[in-house]
């Protein structure tokens, strides 16, 4: 499966052999490394912007000062 967003990566490093269908397995083309890094950077930006469809969960304590603007649903336990 092509890993096209951050939530699709595995916590097991050896399982992450592609990024957006770009081969990053051992022995891959050096050009693939450049393309994969660019793809990860775009995926991180999509997650930051909220356009990837990935939920973002914060565990523990979140302290904020200032204004909190929420668009959509907000669940507090």
Language-model region placement:
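Intrinsic disorder/low-complexity signature
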Residues: 13-15, 31, 74
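N-terminal alpha-helical targeting/anchoring segments
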Residues: 20-23, 31
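Intrinsic low-complexity, repeat-rich intrinsically disordered segments enriched
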Residues: 4-5, 40, 47-77
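Long amphipathic alpha-helical coiled-coil
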Residues: 27-48
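Short, intrinsically disordered N-terminal pre-domain segments
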Residues: 1-20
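Intrinsic disorder/low-complexity segments
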Residues: 24-27, 75
């Amino acid at each position: 499966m092509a890993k096209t967003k951050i939530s699709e990566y595995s916590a097991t490093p050896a399982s992450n052999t592609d990024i957006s269908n770009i081969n990053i397995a051992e022995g891959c083309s050096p050009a693939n490394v450049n393309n994969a890094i660019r793809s990860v950077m775009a995926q991180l930006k999509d997650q930051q912007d909220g356009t990837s469809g990935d939920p973002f969960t914060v565990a523990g304590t979140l302290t904020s000062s200032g204004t909190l603007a929420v668009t959509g649903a907000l669940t507090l336990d």
